[in-house]
């Protein structure tokens, strides 16, 4: 451990040489990319995020794009999946309708997403992460939390230096860049990784956490989206520092269980650990009936509820799927599996249900079923999901309604809101 009263020690991110306390450039290589912090060698929890991932992969593979604004996305009816940093200077943002993006940056090069390639590169980065520590929690194809506690013996370096070496290796061997956030908890590690993109490495220590957060907007807190931020603003709460002055009981009285999160995260308190999960190949939900069912209306009643469960899990896992899979098991234990690939990925219960219903209608022929399941496969980044549908103008309204329902469920619990398909229906076996 280092003395917090001593001048911050640190190292050069380019050559990894230790640095004098007050030098402004590396004494060995001349680089200005010096990393110093009084807690630098004590912190072990990191968030790693690839910089403008899809666009960076395309620029790597086509050097002619290096100095050009690049947008990854669909056609004019689609939305922006990723924009490189040059395009972002012109105001292009993820999830922006493509026509607006091209109005903001008409000279942009638009590239259709190549998900197979991105997944392949993402797995290369993930494999390098797992060489650092077994405690890797992927959040999406291009980002993850890492807990490097106890890895000093393995790497002969504290986590900060191990992470800097990792970032250099990704850049040299894979050809893209990453940004690193290092802290003592997941919330602030993720916040830190966004502070100096691209090629960033930012540190937030425990001693400075409350002061660092004080002036930040409430939207920085995990789980505070636009709708909930508007609720807080109506109550006169805009900055995290205002939450720091409030009692936990008061926040819980006003905002339910979300109030406890506001109280703790506003103070930099986050005990969540890095969770190891195998990489999901699909997300699904199924139910076995107490009595065999043959009528379409009975099967549909279950299908809708299962679709909502799948959508809920996709949203919580920050995933979307491009192929909808229907599973049926007959009364004599024979399994039927049907699937349909969508034009664009989805994470919406409505699209999952409607596609599943089309598949189900072809299987309702008097056969009795003892089980029904619905799921999605070909999992991708949620930024690619559910572009606006100009052919079906009601699709956007249904999506907006589903988002509103999800926000209510996040605030009051999964069973707080029922749709017309599930309200009053039995849930046997679920």
UniProtKB/Swiss-Prot annotation:
It catalyses: DNA(n) + a 2'-deoxyribonucleoside 5'-triphosphate = DNA(n+1) + diphosphate. InterPro entries: DNA/RNA_pol_sf, DNA_pol_Y-fam_lit_finger_sf, DNA_pol_Y-fam_little_finger, DNA_polymerase-Y, DNApol_IV, Rev_trsase/Diguanyl_cyclase, UmuC. Its main location: cytoplasm. One of its GO terms (biological process) is SOS response. The active site is at residue 143. PROSITE patterns: UMUC. One of its GO terms (cellular component) is cytosol. Residues 45-225 form the UmuC domain. Mg(2+) binds at residues 49, 142. CDD domains: PolY_Pol_IV_kappa. Monomer. This is DNA polymerase IV 1. It comes from Rhizobium meliloti (strain 1021). The gene is dinB1.
